[in-house]
A protein has these predicted regions:
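N-terminal "domain-start" segment that seeds a small globular fold
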Residues: 31-67, 87
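Thiol-/selenol-based redox modules, centered on thioredoxin-like
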Residues: 152-155, 159-203
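Bacterial N-terminal signal peptides
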Residues: 12-25
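Amphipathic alpha-helical repeat scaffolds
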Residues: 78-82
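Proline/glycine-enriched tight loop/beta-turn segments at coil->beta junctions
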Residues: 69-74
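Terminal helix/beta-alpha structural elements that buttress the NAD(P)+-binding lobe
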Residues: 51-52, 141, 173, 203
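Structural microenvironment flanking redox-active thiols in thiol-disulfide oxidoreductases
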Residues: 85-150
């Protein structure tokens, strides 16, 4: 009466015994330590010293880390709304549109340092830049670019190039490694062949 059941149990026990024997005979796999988690790259690790600072965005005064422009070719320009060179806004915007896809960014820094030609509030400057002049490249809050109290960015640019701005719309060209690749006086327009050639060299 119990014979079929006993036979079934014997049949089941054989593979189990064999499996146990095989398991015991295999060498234990060496434990592999888990790789330590990668720490996120800090801005200082990937950002040139020139860009390791913050400025307030013109339109809303939100703090912006300049490290976001690391790895790009950057044209830094001190601007003014009531200057004989103010018409260069259109040329700078055209330059930005032409080369943006290849990695160029134009950064505008309004300044009242020369002839008090940028006297307005941030809101007034923003309205003139974005609505009147059609600027789409990044603009920052009013900045001191020469003399006492000048921003560390402009101090570094002047030191690296050997030339401080003499008037509004001075242009510094910075390469992808954060090195100053050129300094151009106000009279050098955005479509000047010298500026375009310098940009092409570092793109």
């Amino acid at each position: 009466m119990y014979t079929p059941l006993l036979n079934t149990l014997r049949a089941l026990s054989l593979p189990m015994s064999l499996a146990l024997a095989l398991t015991c005979s295999l060498p234990a796999a060496a434990a592999t330590p888990a790789a330590p988690p990668k720490s996120p790259a800090t801005p200082a690790a990937n950002c040139p010293a020139l860009w390791q600072q913050q400025f307030k965005r013109l339109q809303d005064e939100a703090p912006q880390a300049l490290c976001q422009y690391a790895g790009k070719v950057v044209l830094v320009v001190n601007t003014a709304s009531y200057c004989g060179f103010t018409g260069q806004y259109q040329g700078l915007e055209a330059l930005y549109a032409r080369y943006q896809a290849r990695g160029l960014v134009v950064l505008g820094f309004p300044s009242n340092d020369f002839g008090q030609q940028e006297p307005g509030s941030g809101k007034e400057i923003a309205d003139f830049c974005f609505n009147t002049s059609g600027v789409k490249f990044p603009m920052f809050s009013k900045t001191v670019v020469v003399g006492t109290g000048r921003s560390p960015l402009y101090a570094a640019l002047a030191k690296a190039s050997g030339e401080a701005p003499q008037w509004n719309f001075h242009k510094y060209l910075v390469d992808r490694q954060g090195r100053v690749a050129g300094s151009f006086a106000s009279g050098v327009t955005p479509d000047d062949k010298r500026l375009l050639a310098a940009i092409e060299r570092v793109l």
